A protein has these predicted regions:
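N-terminal cleavable signal peptides for secretion/export
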Residues: 1-41
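C-terminal, non-catalytic interaction/recognition modules in large multi-subunit enzymes and RNPs
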Residues: 13, 28-29, 40, 106, ...
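Surface-exposed beta-loop interaction hotspot
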Residues: 78-148
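Acidic/His-leaning functional-site neighborhoods
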Residues: 148-196, 206
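Forkhead-associated
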Residues: 26-73
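Short helix/loop capping segments that flank catalytic or ligand/cofactor-binding pockets
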Residues: 100-102, 127-129, 182-184, 211-214, ...
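Long, compositionally biased interface segments
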Residues: 193-244
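Broad, structure-driven detector of short, well-ordered beta-strand segments within folded domains
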Residues: 42-47, 77-84, 159-164
Length: 244
């Protein structure tokens, strides 16, 4: 069911892949002698030097494959990829024919509203914070400061604040908003251009996008910190995943 201010958009290629993730499997075996089987993957697996090693793989001339984080191999409609977090290696399994992948049919997206392209001021405040991933694991994260801004409906002088990280010279933010009470995904991601020399930038909330976790709960996305949950609804950007 959609609302008058939203449309249904087909999945992008990236979102199709997000939906196909069936598992993030942490590999703690460290030698061929204690290699483990992984649900949805052939052969047996162990970790070595930050990579995962698969052995006894069918249709592989060497019978073995090494997948460092970001490496992947394709096996028909399935994909196997290396991953790591805090020095622990994992094997990610993707299957576009999985029930989860087939259940995702599109993304509900709010209509564009240029009123939600807002001016913002950046205040540098670099610090190390605790980041909580979707599976509850905590780890350190580096933030670079705050963006301060007003949104449509604010009273004169009212403002909001988001803590941001650096991403390739621009800003990245994981944020939640009060719209979650009306069906918007509990949190979304947003990229913001770097501030100019006077600290000015522009936030386009229309570009708010769903995290990979919205498509498959096998992802381990960073949750927004309490300070990044806005007390107003943000009725623009991607709203939620549509399923059968």
């Amino acid at each position: 069911m959609t609302h008058a201010d939203t449309d249904i958009r087909p999945l992008t290629a990236d979102q199709q892949e997000f939906a196909a993730l069936t598992g993030t499997h942490w590999i703690r075996a460290s030698s061929p002698s204690d290699a483990v089987t992984v649900t949805g993957a052939p052969g047996t697996w162990y970790a070595d030097g930050g990579a995962v090693i698969g052995t006894g793989l069918p249709d592989n001339p060497q019978g073995q494959v090494r997948l460092a984080p970001g490496d992947r191999i394709v096996d028909g409609g399935r994909v196997f990829a290396g991953h790591a977090r805090a020095g622990v290696a994992a094997l990610r399994t993707f299957d576009r024919d999985s029930e989860g992948a087939r259940s995702v049919t599109g993304v509900e997206v709010f209509w564009q509203d240029d009123a939600w392209v807002v001016d913002a001021e950046f205040t540098a405040d670099p610090q190390t914070v605790t980041v909580i991933s979707a599976d509850g694991v905590e780890g350190p994260g580096e933030v670079v400061g705050w963006l301060s801004f007003s949104v449509p409906g604010d009273a004169p002088g009212e403002s909001h604040h988001l803590q941001v990280t650096d991403q390739d010279g621009d800003f990245f933010v994981s944020f939640g908003d009060a719209g979650a009470q009306a069906g918007t995904h509990p949190f979304r991601f947003l990229n913001v251009p770097a501030a100019d020399q006077d600290g000015h930038t522009t936030i386009d909330f229309n570009a708010a996008r769903l995290p990979a976790l919205a498509f498959s709960d096998a992802y381990l996305c960073p949750l927004p910190s309490a300070v990044n949950v806005l007390d107003v609804a943000v009725p623009v950007g991607e709203k939620r995943v549509v399923r059968k």
